[in-house]
Regions:
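Glycine-rich, positively charged N-terminal anion/phosphate-binding segment
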Residues: 2-13, 26-122
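Active-site beta-loop-alpha junctions enriched in small/polar residues
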Residues: 24-26, 49-51, 109-111, 135-137, ...
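Alpha/beta catalytic cores of nucleotide-metabolism and tRNA/nucleoside-modifying enzymes
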Residues: 1-25, 30-31, 38, 81-83, ...
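Active-site beta->alpha loop and helix N-cap motifs at the rims of alpha/beta catalytic domains
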Residues: 69-175, 181-185, 189
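Short beta-strand segments at enzyme active-site cores
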Residues: 46, 130-134, 172-180, 203-207, ...
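Non-cysteine beta-strand/loop elements that form the S-adenosyl-L-methionine
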Residues: 46, 129-138, 198-209, 262-269
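Conserved radical SAM core fold
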Residues: 49-55, 134-148, 205-213
């Protein structure tokens, strides 16, 4: 039976036939996505980023990393009138347009149609699609009415999707999709999915676990065929997520359940070559993965804490290199510990210097605080001086009648005319013009 297919926008991507990197908070940053693409991922999802975190950011082209950075300053100094002088600028979202621009899906955390549209509109020109997170069970997401909490407020979820389709998808010619979890009963899940596919989305991903379930619990696929059928009736692509460990397994599950694609999460966190089929080489050794990950991490100057976390997932816990890596404080030290070669070690040293990490002396929190305090005091003094100048009587601000405008012919050197050169300013001769002083 032939099913209808919703049209894919000009700049969007079709999820059908795709094995993709799942959105993961710490494991979906720029170098992880680039590594997944290198080893065969068809599309990559970025980590859930809250709409309010992106709103207020400045889009910057980074000539050093060749990335597009969305950055912002802390609100602390600004709200106390100190401006941004002396503050560190934080990177909220970083993407590599040349490598991943046409394959990157931005996942948004939101609970409001208006802020969702505002944030998504900022990044839409740089990505291939916007995906709404309606499945994250973590408190940082659900307490704000986002993530899996949206499953309990279907009216709000549908309103968000409809607003994004109309105001962002149509205007920027990209697709809008949603990622959900299954509900407790088949009937409840079907009712929800039927509403979602009618909002104008181009794709739906289902994580085959309920909200209370955790990754260690086995995925439930009993409802999957029903969800696939509902999506296909509406012409929507359906992806599955949960306990998918490799490309070959994903293809097998797609055939078994009829899904259009699959997401890989935990397995990709440990070894991104899981996106490569056995016939193309299968899993690469961890040493290769660690080296390639380090290369990407340094090229985009990834935050060191995130890089170290990912290396801890990639390097087996019992390997001597794992313990050596755990003691490192920056890229240079870990490049030496992993024996990555002269080229990468040299790159690591330069990255550490730019990021002020590792063996490079880093400005302490107390030093930054003191610098910010001085900047705030200076700004306050300037404001007070400006205010005082405005209130000063006009006559007192005018020039005194007795004051004379300095002229060249009355300028004099304050020393005897017969002074020797050795006793005067080093480069001034007796015949020099007073203008040269």
């Amino acid at each position: 039976m032939t099913h209808p297919r919703v049209p894919i926008p000009k700049r969007g991507v079709d999820y059908r036939g795709k094995i993709v990197l799942a959105p993961m908070v710490r494991s979906g940053e720029c170098p992880s996505r680039l590594l997944a693409l290198k080893y065969g991922a068809d599309l990559v999802w970025g980590p859930e980023t809250i709409d309010k975190a992106l709103i207020g950011c400045t889009r910057r082209l980074n000539p050093i990393t060749n990335t597009v950075d969305f950055t912002r300053y802390s609100n602390n100094g600004v709200k106390h009138g100190g401006g941004t002088e002396g503050q560190r600028e934080s990177v909220i979202y970083r993407l590599h347009p040349e490598i991943e621009g046409t394959k990157l899906i931005y996942q948004i955390g939101t609970s409001d149609p208006e802020t969702a549209v505002q944030a998504a509109s900022m990044i839409a020109p740089d990505v291939a699609g916007i995906d709404v997170n309606a499945g994250c069970p973590k408190p940082f997401s659900t307490t704000g009415g986002m993530g899996a909490a949206l499953l309990k407020t279907p009216d709000k979820l549908c309103a968000i999707l409809e607003a994004l389709v109309k105001e962002v998808g149509n205007k920027h010619e990209i697709g809008i999709s949603v990622k959900i979890r299954i509900l407790d009963t088949l009937e409840d899940t079907e009712k929800l999915v039927r509403r979602l596919v009618a909002t104008g989305i181009t794709g739906l991903t289902v994580h085959c676990r309920t909200t209370p379930m955790r990754p260690r619990e086995r995925a439930i696929r009993d409802q999957l065929r029903m969800i696939v059928n509902v999506c296909h009736e509406a012409g929507i692509a359906c992806l599955m997520n949960g306990d998918v460990t490799s490309r070959d397994e994903a293809l097998q599950l797609m055939q078994e359940y009829g899904t259009d694609g699959a997401m890989i999460a935990t397995a990709a966190e440990k070894n991104s070559s899981c996106f490569r089929s056995e016939k193309d080489g299968g899993l690469a050794p961890w040493q290769e993965i660690a080296k390639e990950y380090m290369r990407f991490a340094m090229e985009v100057e990834n935050r060191w804490g995130n890089t170290k976390f990912l290396l801890a997932q990639i390097i087996p816990g019992k390997a001597p290199a794992h313990q050596a890596m755990a003691k490192t404080r920056g890229y240079f030290e870990v490049a030496q510990a992993l024996e990555l070669g002269d080229e990468l070690i040299a790159l690591a040293k330069s990255v550490d210097e730019r990021l002020e990490i590792g063996v490079v002396k880093k400005e302490t929190k107390a030093e930054r605080k003191a610098k910010n305090k001085v900047a705030q005091q200076t700004a306050q003094e300037k404001r007070e001086q400006k205010a005082a100048a405005k209130t000063m009587p006009r006559t007192s601000r005018s020039r005194s009648p007795a004051a004379k405008k300095r002229k060249v012919d009355i300028g004099e050197l304050n020393m005897p005319l017969d002074v020797s050169r050795e006793m005067g300013p080093g480069t001034v001769t007796g015949q020099a013009s007073t203008l040269a002083v």
